Amino acid sequence: MASGIIDVSSRYSVPETLARLQSIFKEKGIMVFALIDHSGEAEKVGLKMRPTQLLIFGSPKGGTPLMVAAPRLAIDLPLKALAWQDKQRHVWLSYNSPEYLQQRHGFPADLLKNIAGIAALIQKAVE
């Protein structure tokens, strides 16, 4: 995790993985701001790309105090989850480690709880 990115194996397809994650977010009241289908957009211009989709999500209640404490954190918020398929056709769900974001932007450790719960939600989506 030297890059700050955590990769979690998913037994579901890329679209199914993100649909599961979106359902979990809906239950928890977490906003989904956008779903970007990188591979779908590539196909529209005649390029091939393994299935790759990005979900942008967050909660102003959780994220705003973080950005007040560390304004440059806004470059990494809202949070993102990337579902992608590797060369062996295995699907992964990747996201920025909350601890890495805390280290990168230097927001107070007591605010880490505002985003730390993402790990459990990601894990639930791929089970």
Regions found by a protein language model. Give the residues of each.
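Terminal, regulation- and interaction-focused segments at domain boundaries
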Residues: 1-29
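Short glycine-enriched loop/turn motifs at secondary-structure junctions
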Residues: 2-3, 26, 48-50, 86
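Compact, glycine-rich, soluble single-domain proteins
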Residues: 33-79
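Beta-strand/loop substructures that line and gate deep hydrophobic ligand-binding cavities in soluble
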Residues: 80-108
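Well-ordered alpha/beta subsegment
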Residues: 103-127
